[in-house]
Amino acid sequence: MSQLLSVTRGLYSMPPAHGSAIVDIILHNSELTRQWQEELGQMRQRIHNLRADLVNVLNQQQDERDFSFIAHERGMFSFLGLSVEQVHRLKNEFSIYMTDTSRISVAGLTVERMDYVSQAIVKVLRP
């Protein structure tokens, strides 16, 4: 057990340098920095588009609840404002996973699955 603790402590006290070494290489090479910034911009735009698509599809499928706040947020996640019971129904009935606080990974959505996810959300909103 003491050997395991020793190894574990070493990992936490001295985290691997791989990540920082990669960042160092990218930021000290102008071509790699440009490529990284371009890819980052593409991912930012993808998430922005997914947010807009989610709002549009949800609004087309129901009109009881305003989901426009999703389009105005930033980042990879969004809180949907669902109850714990509704979140559990999404998980158990539709295999859609999120935290119990209804925080969904927008970055994890795809255009192909948008209708399915939206329809499931609408179904759990209705009694």
Task: Please name every model-derived segment.
Residues 1-37:
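Conserved core segment of the aminotransferase class I/II
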Residues 15-17, 69-72, 98:
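A structural signal for short secondary-structure junctions
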Residues 11, 15, 42, 46, ...:
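Catalytic cores of large soluble enzymes that bind and process phosphate-bearing ligands
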